[in-house]
Amino acid sequence: MRSEQQFLDEYGVSHQNPVNLVVHMLCVPAIFIATFALLWFVPVGRFVPGLPAAAAPYVNAATLGLPLVLGFYGLLSLRALLVGALWLAVSFALILGGIAAALPVLWIAAAVWVLAWGVQFYGHQVEGAKPSFADDLVFLLIGPLFVQQKFNRLLGKRQPQAQ
């Protein structure tokens, strides 16, 4: 398996244009959160025999995907695992907060997901390069690490090299 730095370097090749970088800084977080929100509404818990009814809403495609996503990040590095855990925690806090506020989270997530992907494809058109995930779907999980690295640089934080 490629190292975290190899993934980031490869991802960075098709993310050089300043417009595309801004697009990614805005849209990657939106897509990440919206994707997990959409997956939240794929119920699984109600089909699990013996699962307490109170737990059923929390057993869904998003929570079942959680160990897979964190496992991948953990294979890359501790830093990737911590960044991934932070992004997932923010995602789940927004999802649960939206549900608690009786917002139409599913519809908001669907609209954000479609709009953000449209803007992403525009960014790649400006870049003149196809999205990295067109060659390897794992790059859908590298985008958040790339964006976090860019955010850290904007904030003036030294970015350690991935191991």
Task: Annotate each language-model stretch with its function.
Residues 1-10, 125-163:
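Membrane-proximal soluble regions of multi-pass membrane proteins
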Residues 43-48, 78-82, 121-137:
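Juxtamembrane/interfacial segments flanking transmembrane helices
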Residues 64-72, 86-95:
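Hydrophobic, membrane-inserted alpha-helices
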Residues 49-63, 106-111:
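Structural signature of hydrophobic alpha-helical transmembrane segments
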Residues 8-29, 35, 69-80, 126-128, ...:
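Membrane interfacial helix-start motif at the N-side
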Residues 82-87, 104-111:
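Hydrophobic alpha-helical membrane segments of integral membrane proteins
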Residues 66-79, 112-129, 144-151:
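Transmembrane alpha-helical segments that form the membrane-embedded catalytic/substrate-channel core
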Residues 32-51, 88-100:
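Juxtamembrane "helix exit" motif at the C-terminal ends of alpha-helical transmembrane segments
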